[in-house]
């Protein structure tokens, strides 16, 4: 199955206070668990503006990281766990589980910004 870069649906309204996880579709491969190295394709969008700030798809290479080891923002460490390879999941990550009051990306992510990611688990 060939997957393509997803469009991110902008929910509007008030951002959630806690991590919101929604499976867009569930994969049928191995389950991602803490301590494993995972490979994730993603699109990231700012909740307040709907503007895309980053996407691994644009680089053609998924992001590899050790799950649960603090190599990525907390919302990812929590939100990717339990995904199955081949699955796509939407994560809405409040600032305290993302970049907090410091923002990131050279101004692309504002301080206190809630983030929306659509993540595809490519491999574990």
Curated annotation (Swiss-Prot):
| EC number(s) per entry | 5.2.1.8
Domain PPIase FKBP-type: start-end pairs: 35-124
Q: What class of enzyme is it?
A: isomerase
Q: Which UniProt keywords apply?
A: Isomerase, Rotamase
**InterPro entries, A to Z:** PPIase_dom_sf, PPIase_FKBP_dom
What Pfam families does the database record attribute to this sequence? FKBP_C
Regulation of its function:
Inhibited by FK506, ascomycin and rapamycin.
Give yes or no: UniProt keyword Isomerase: yes
- What's an example of a GO molecular-function annotation for this chain? peptidyl-prolyl cis-trans isomerase activity
Catalysed reaction per UniProt? [protein]-peptidylproline (omega=180) = [protein]-peptidylproline (omega=0)
Q: What does this protein do?
A: PPIases accelerate the folding of proteins.
| Protein family (similarity comment) | Belongs to the FKBP-type PPIase family.
Q: What is this protein called?
A: FK506-binding protein
């Amino acid at each position: 199955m060939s997957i393509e870069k997803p469009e991110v649906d902008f929910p509007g309204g008030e951002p959630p206070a806690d991590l919101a996880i929604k499976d867009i579709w569930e994969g049928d491969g191995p389950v991602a668990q803490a301590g494993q190295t995972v490979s994730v394709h993603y699109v990231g969008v700012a909740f307040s503006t709907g503007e895309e700030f980053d996407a691994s798809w644009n680089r053609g290479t998924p992001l590899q990281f050790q799950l649960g080891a603090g190599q990525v923002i907390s919302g990812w460490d929590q939100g990717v766990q339990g995904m199955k390879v081949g699955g796509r999941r939407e994560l809405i990550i409040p600032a305290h589980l993302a970049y907090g009051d410091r923002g990131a990306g050279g101004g692309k992510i504002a301080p206190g910004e809630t983030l929306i990611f659509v993540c595809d688990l490519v491999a574990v």
